[in-house]
């Protein structure tokens, strides 16, 4: 990330020395126990999707906290890992909206310009949200602010109350915000199912003269 557009623009949004603070945090927590995702995948979202390519942002809360699940991409798991409940519901809504995606791995979305960003980028094994509020929010808020400043239209997909709180970071009127209940089994029937975020995203992109996302890839 160090020589990327991401690095330069995120750095401008953060206090002096914040990257060093993050590296110190990572050194400490990875030395102290099992942390997900693997350290080399902590920044996978911005390493896979260049800033210039971002057309869509799907914001999650924090990584999966079970073995071999987290890849550094929100909601995604490797294909040899069963889809967790929220991802099952995302794929169910996708099937109802556009068609069936066979893969649980969402890397193909990231490679097409879908920034799969979690607000927190690390989690201890078995302890959801344990790193919330420690270091990540200023960093990931900075990423959202950087995307907000893009001159090209972007779709921000915000699922659930946590993600929807980030609306105040999205001030550019040319962007589209799609929001609904979270795909979690606890809330999916309260407005996530039937919200058609995938076709709505593509309709917007096409209307703006941009390539739609192949959500089934």
Curated annotation (Swiss-Prot):
UniProt-listed InterPro entries: UDG_fam1, Ura-DNA_Glyclase_AS, Uracil-DNA_glycosylase-like, Uracil-DNA_glycosylase-like_sf
Subcellular localization, as worded in the UniProt entry: Cytoplasm
Gene Ontology annotations for the cellular component aspect, listed alphabetically: cytoplasm
EC code: 3.2.2.27
Keywords assigned: Cytoplasm, DNA damage, DNA repair, Hydrolase
One biological process term in Gene Ontology: base-excision repair, AP site formation via deaminated base removal
Main location: cytoplasm
Superkingdom, natural source: Bacteria
Entries under SMART domains matching the protein: UDG, UreE_C
Reactions it catalyzes: Hydrolyzes single-stranded DNA or mismatched double-stranded DNA and polynucleotides, releasing free uracil
Positions annotated as active site in the UniProt record: 62 (proton acceptor)
Keyword Cytoplasm among UniProt keywords: yes
Family annotation (Gene3D superfamilies): Uracil-DNA glycosylase-like domain
A Pfam family the protein falls into: UDG
GO MF entries: uracil DNA N-glycosylase activity
HAMAP family assigned to the protein according to its UniProt record, in alphabetical order: UDG
Main function: Excises uracil residues from the DNA which can arise as a result of misincorporation of dUMP residues by DNA polymerase or due to deamination of cytosine.
Family, similarity comment: Belongs to the uracil-DNA glycosylase (UDG) superfamily. UNG family.
PANTHER family (alphabetical): URACIL-DNA GLYCOSYLASE (PTHR11264:SF0)
Name listed for the protein in its UniProt record: Uracil-DNA glycosylase
